[in-house]
């Protein structure tokens, strides 16, 4: 008897070629539902509609098509269990040897502007996941394909193994099937959580899933295997970036690129550039042009910039490209790259050059693994509002000082705590990152700034527990400080600022970064 394949897909890419090979090369019979059956029929292929095979018509406007014992019995039957075979024979059910199914485009639907809840709900597949899970469960006896990218590999398996896919292939396909349904259900749960958020006090379940995008050479270190996963079915963020040149991206490249993106997303109105090393900015600056912004960022700490990750919020032009080629860089990302600039950058073929049109959109949550679970928090994407800042010293800020304070505050937000940033002329002069005491970070930032600290601004991501940081800053020539406040000894720091003639502004918002 000919083997039986069930084909029911929303994405019909490659389905005709697959079906033709199944029929002509391997003597499969085909059963199919809805639009897939029509597509096969239009292509001149012999196909039996699911409704004709089961004897039950599609009902509820197509909501029930494949949910039938003749379908699921054929999928779930164990060929090495006599009672299962007897049950099939008694109910005139043929065993199904191949299931090809992909799911309604739920994520694509909810991504459309103005889509209603009713429209979204109608794109929640029921029969598809049921078949996908059933066939994945029974991998010992049949194969399941849920992605057109699997079709050629499956056919090659049949050609090399006398018409039967290997157990290894079936196991991999089953794992992909379960991963696909998990990701699909996660997308639905997240979408409905957002939809129903007004009366959900909290989310009791949090599911994290993704599709493997790329195996990375290694993780942070060569002994750590690593993989890059994409969330959702539609590429977004770095999965949507275009690599114009250079080697494959590494784990550390991607981590640093994301750190660079977060900083550059703070600045939209003015050309901005940042250079990242080990997720911290060694130089960030604004300029009248993107070329000027990059040069200022580079000169802020040219030593640390070597081997850095550069992010720009404007297209790369020829002038900027020429500057970029003057030192060794790991990666450069910008919204786009002009043709002449690309020719210039090509002279440094090892530099990874990427374009990503949307550098401002990032994940809404951050997730960290801990022993026995993981932690989830909303992203620190609060927008700085200077109208809510409190000037706590006798000296009031000028408009220019307020703009500089805002720049320093935005950069400091993305430096590892304890974080101190010294700036002037919308350019970082010194960055103190990751120290175990705040005054230690102050000293590092001031040492980097050197003589340029005179007349500069200092930002701190957390409050000052003592007035020593204020006095150290004043001794180096700092004239204004922005910090969140909230210490029991705020009055000591404010008094020191007044005594030393400094301006101090409290934001009321802390930006720890661990």
Swiss-Prot record:
Q: Which Gene3D superfamilies match?
A: 3.40.140.20, Methylglyoxal synthase-like domain
Record field: catalytic activity: (6R)-10-formyltetrahydrofolate + 5-amino-1-(5-phospho-beta-D-ribosyl)imidazole-4-carboxamide = 5-formamido-1-(5-phospho-D-ribosyl)imidazole-4-carboxamide + (6S)-5,6,7,8-tetrahydrofolate; IMP + H2O = 5-formamido-1-(5-phospho-D-ribosyl)imidazole-4-carboxamide
SMART domains with a match to the protein in the record: AICARFT_IMPCHas, MGS
Q: Which PROSITE patterns does the record associate with it?
A: MGS
Lineage, top-rank taxon, reads Bacteria
Quote the EC number: 2.1.2.3, 3.5.4.10
Task: Give UniProt keywords alphabetically.
Answer: Hydrolase, Multifunctional enzyme, Purine biosynthesis, Transferase
Its Gene Ontology cellular component terms are: cytosol
**Among the record's GO biological process terms, what is one?**
'de novo' IMP biosynthetic process
Keyword Hydrolase set for record:
yes
Q: Name one GO molecular function term.
A: phosphoribosylaminoimidazolecarboxamide formyltransferase activity
MGS-like domain residues are 1-146
Q: Does the keyword Hydrolase apply?
A: yes
Q: In which pathway does it act?
A: Purine metabolism; IMP biosynthesis via de novo pathway; 5-formamido-1-(5-phospho-D-ribosyl)imidazole-4-carboxamide from 5-amino-1-(5-phospho-D-ribosyl)imidazole-4-carboxamide (10-formyl THF route): step 1/1; Purine metabolism; IMP biosynthesis via de novo pathway; IMP from 5-formamido-1-(5-phospho-D-ribosyl)imidazole-4-carboxamide: step 1/1
Classification via PANTHER family: BIFUNCTIONAL PURINE BIOSYNTHESIS PROTEIN ATIC, BIFUNCTIONAL PURINE BIOSYNTHESIS PROTEIN PURH
Stated family: Belongs to the PurH family.
- Return the domain comment text from this UniProt entry: The IMP cyclohydrolase activity resides in the N-terminal region.
**Which NCBIfam families does the entry link to?**
PRK00881.1, purH
Q: What is this protein called?
A: Bifunctional purine biosynthesis protein PurH
This protein's species is Nostoc punctiforme (strain ATCC 29133 / PCC 73102)
């Amino acid at each position: 008897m000919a083997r039986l394949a069930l084909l029911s897909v929303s994405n019909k890419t490659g389905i005709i070629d697959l079906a033709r090979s199944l029929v002509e090369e391997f003597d499969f019979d085909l059963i199919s539902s809805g639009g897939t059956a029509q597509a096969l029929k239009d292509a001149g292929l012999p196909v039996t509609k699911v409704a004709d095979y089961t004897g039950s018509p599609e009902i509820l406007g197509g909501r029930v098509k494949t949910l039938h014992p003749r379908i699921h019995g054929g999928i779930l039957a164990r060929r090495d269990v006599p009672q299962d075979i007897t049950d099939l024979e008694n109910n005139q059910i043929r065993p199904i040897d191949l299931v090809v199914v992909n799911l309604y485009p739920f994520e694509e639907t909810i991504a459309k502007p103005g889509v209603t809840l009713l429209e979204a709900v109608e794109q929640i597949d029921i029969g598809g996941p049921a078949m996908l899970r059933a066939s994945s469960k029974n991998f010992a006896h049949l194969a399941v394909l849920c992605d057109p990218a699997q079709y050629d590999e499956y056919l090659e398996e049949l050609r090399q193994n006398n018409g039967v896919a290997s157990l290894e292939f079936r196991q991999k396909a089953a794992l992909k099937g379960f991963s696909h349904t998990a990701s699909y259900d996660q997308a639905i749960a997240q979408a409905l959580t957002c939809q129903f958020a007004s009366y959900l006090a909290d989310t009791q379940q949090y599911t994290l899933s993704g599709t493997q995008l790329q195996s990375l050479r290694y993780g942070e270190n060569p002994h750590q295997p690593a993989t890059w996963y994409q969330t959702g079915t539609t590429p977004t963020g770095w999965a949507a970036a275009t690599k114009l040149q250079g080697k494959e991206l590494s784990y550390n490249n991607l981590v640093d690129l994301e750190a660079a993106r977060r900083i550059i997303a703070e600045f939209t109105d003015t050309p901005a550039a940042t250079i990242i090393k080990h997720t911290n900015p060694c130089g960030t600056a604004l300029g009248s042009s993107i070329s000027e912004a990059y040069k200022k960022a580079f000169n802020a700490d040219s030593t640390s910039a070597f081997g850095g990750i550069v992010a720009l919020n404007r297209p790369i032009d020829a002038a900027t490209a020429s500057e970029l080629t003057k030192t060794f860089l790991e990666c450069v990302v910008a919204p786009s790259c002009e043709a002449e600039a690309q020719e210039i950058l090509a002279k440094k073929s090892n530099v990874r050059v990427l374009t990503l049109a949307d550098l401002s959109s990032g994940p809404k949550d951050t997730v960290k693994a801990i022993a026995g679970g993981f932690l989830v928090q909303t992203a620190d994407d609060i927008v700085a509002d200077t109208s809510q800042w409190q000037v706590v010293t006798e000296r009031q800020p000028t408009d220019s000082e307020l703009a500089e304070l805002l720049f320093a505050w935005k950069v400091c937000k993305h430096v590892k705590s304890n974080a101190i940033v010294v700036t002037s002329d919308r350019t970082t002069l010194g960055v103190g990152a990751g120290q175990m005491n705040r005054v230690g970070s102050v000293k590092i930032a001031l040492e980097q700034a050197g003589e340029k600290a005179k007349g500069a601004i200092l930002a701190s991501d957390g409050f000052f527990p003592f007035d020593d940081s204020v006095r150290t800053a004043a001794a180096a020539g700092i004239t204004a400080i922005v910090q969140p406040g909230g210490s029991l000894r705020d009055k000591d720091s404010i008094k020191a600022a007044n005594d030393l003639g400094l301006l101090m502004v409290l934001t009321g918002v802390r930006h720890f970064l661990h």
